[in-house]
């Protein structure tokens, strides 16, 4: 008989093992009776329908759903005292006792409660203990101690201990199972009842339901149907963000293991798919979200859910399943606070007969809004059937919370949410209670007003406290702010006065560094609707020639974003020339060679701005005062740039002078008062660079390349041995305003001296020529680094390419072996003298031989000589190397004396002697310990030589040998491992 049942049971793997994963697999394995399989249909029933039990222990119709079905007036309930890590117990009890169906059944057990005795510890009925605990929470005004439950913890679960942290879902399953056993013990032959009958207990009728499992063969499309009893649904939330997504994943069709299902039609193992559906929904649906894994980790993601759920789309296609109500409402839940299942805290949330929710945190009870309930990271949720929604069609079932509880027979007004009118509001609303859960006479009216406000504003909020009746004035104020907003300095609109003040503050801090446009252009910018998109200001062009004339095309850019990183002064300026007063390139100018009169007119307005109470005012009077000053500066600068155009004779000088002019003219901040007090120079006489008097000395503002020239001049002074005066600004060949050319300097000038120095005329008689390795900072007469780059090579960077000037580099012209010979020949010297001598020797050898083959032979010979010299140097270093503790030095007596032939390589007599003392510590026949102090040991032998002859007498060979060894070691000598017998005889 068992053999005939194997194919049928192979069709469906047990539910906990088939849909298990890392989350919650342990709890499913611990409760094998949680879900049972029914593969034996009644002989007279359809095999595709749920079988009917032979006996019903408690009818399903006797379960009273909802708080209104009981004659008792239900209270909120008190908290429960935590007696030591019992938060899991308190939270589970609070969640169970706030389920209306379970609470109504416990209260109805008055007859059994009178006959059952629960006073004895470790015995009694757990159902009566639950009923008394429920009555205690309803009657007391303070927190109760659930001692009737935790005193029977061993009866509920054997491995649970009071005071230890446990899992709330595990305790829930064992508690419900214990209550079922207690109910079955009322019947005499309960052990003989089949599984279908045992599932008809009150606990089975409240929490129990049936799932239809359909396994479809992919080869012959044969469908095998089985039914499974369940009391909770374990939903995987790893790939779900809401409760509906978790339901979709649980009831979706999944593929079984390939070739792992034995089909009844094919009679072989094939691939198949499996899908669950609701055959009979439970009255109270218990949902556990798989937040814990096997190793104790917790998945703390937020799972959104609604207070009402509809499971109609997951119902089976059978007529009985389609006719049942599948709309549920939230009644209670258990939450877990913590990072893992081994630590944390459990709390509970329960509903009352008024429809409000309360949070139960051990002994603390406080009301909680529906919005906070839905935002809670739930662990266990209890939903109960909503029979009030079962009468209406599924399409007309609203998802929001009703204003009434829905279980009374009183008619609902048409203005409430349950009305099927077109203006019906769908969504969560407040129940007809106040903030603390107490009803008032205006609750229903207030809810209707909230609904109208929601329809006007287009918002749907869950609670009335979030509704705002003053939104039209706020909207009007916001529109007014938008209308009156003006463009700020960055081109964006802002209605906040703080942003305007902050932008003005930034402009005040930067007014002495940055050019500011004129008032007329500011007015034009405000009148014209410029673009509001952010644009970067034009930066100074450091690569183009500033002396080339370009087309005058003034471009006005509406963006007025100041540069936020101005260059600060590195020198304490106390006076400045007019040529350094030119500001930074204006963002309104797109090129360097635009109309300079416009640029200077804008820069002249920089001094026209004044600070008034921390704000920048562009006064017309202050701007008109400096009009003549701006015109004079314009004429002077025009003459300056005309002279610069005439003095530009080469491309290298132009490229070098252009960035320095910009640095001198644009990037040095100047004080406004000093620049205003200085009179403009004559247009015919170009101004010279400024000489500044400060506390540290006299400073001269020049360009960076002039500093390099002065450094080179210092070198020239050392070579020539004659003092050189510092050139005055009028005679400096680097002066950008000088009309003379740099090539017309007299030989006495530092530039001529440096030219002679680099050409080699003055260098031949004083010092050795410099070796140009491409990394020295010496520059040529034109002050450019391009000539140094021309001498460098691209060797080692891939294919051979030309140098900077398009010709092969100087290093590439020489053979590679010769270059290596030059480098190796000068390897051994630290001071560098050998390098020069080796290079000179190689050059002399190369110049003496004109043939290329001779050059290669010479190079090879030099390589061999250099290698031999390096080997000789290395040998000398090894001989002269001092001992730094890296090599162990061992003294040995084998190298001298008559025992040289008996020495062993690597033998260390000191190590053997020290080790022998430790090895023979307790040896020697007499049992006396050998002391490490040899002097003490010697005295010991002298004092005890007459008591017993331990060493065979004073004249024995062993005693004499040890004494000789001590004298030999004290003298600093060594010894071999074994002494010859002839020497021992001589000692004796």
From Swiss-Prot:
Amino acid composition bias (Polar residues), ranges on this chain: 532-544, 602-631, 735-747, 762-782
Compositional bias ranges of the Basic and acidic residues kind: 632-649
Biased composition annotated in UniProt, kind: Acidic residues: 592-601, 650-659, 707-717
Region feature (Disordered): 16-55, 393-422, 483-782, 868-988
GO molecular function: cysteine-type deubiquitinase activity
Chief site of localization: nucleus
Enzyme class: hydrolase
EC number: 3.4.19.12
Subcellular location(s) of the protein: Nucleus, Nucleolus
Catalytic activity from the UniProt record: Thiol-dependent hydrolysis of ester, thioester, amide, peptide and isopeptide bonds formed by the C-terminal Gly of ubiquitin (a 76-residue protein attached to proteins as an intracellular targeting signal)
USP domain sequence ranges: 78-386
Location of Phosphothreonine modifications: 561, 565, 685, 728, 749
Signal peptide: none
Bias kind Low complexity: ranges: 31-48, 408-422, 490-509, 669-679, 892-903, 930-943
Keywords: Hydrolase, Nucleus, Phosphoprotein, Protease, Thiol protease, Ubl conjugation pathway
Biased composition (Pro residues): 680-689
GO biological process, one term: somatic stem cell population maintenance
Active site positions: 87, 345
Function: Required for maintaining multiple types of adult stem cells, including male and female germline, epithelial follicle cell and intestinal stem cells. May function as a transcriptional repressor by continually deubiquiting histone H2B at the promoters of genes critical for cellular differentiation, thereby preventing histone H3 'Lys-4' trimethylation (H3K4). Controls selective autophagy activation by ubiquitinated proteins.
Protein name: Ubiquitin carboxyl-terminal hydrolase 36
Organism: Drosophila simulans
